[in-house]
């Protein structure tokens, strides 16, 4: 009888290790599920998107950072036969406009989030919480358990090995290229 929460993917498996009952609901069904009491909490998107969906009307606690998804990956899926039927110029146009769209989305998204979480707090009574280092460490430990379980799948094991190799290389850059994590906001 744990917390009932909308969560997706492997992050849901992490949450289950903490006794959370997870379910994957499409975005359009989350508000109604919260309103009816079918779920107690949700993970969905960035604060700007969550606010547009009205979540602030029903849930009054936001937790940051999103440990399970530090970035959003955008994609455009095109049928291979359709792609192969395009001219080089059409392919180039699609590549340029999708890259521009992603850059624009990242820039605007980051620019809007701070004001939105402040507005949620001041106008709608939402409390913003910052995960402690201890809690983030617990999530990481549970995540690594999920990884070990998932590595039984050969494809997952291959992807994880590739990711881990990249991560090891990136750790050096991130250790010297960025400021340390700031203190939690007051």
Provide a role label for each language-model segment:
Residues 1-186:
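N-terminal secretory/targeting leader peptides
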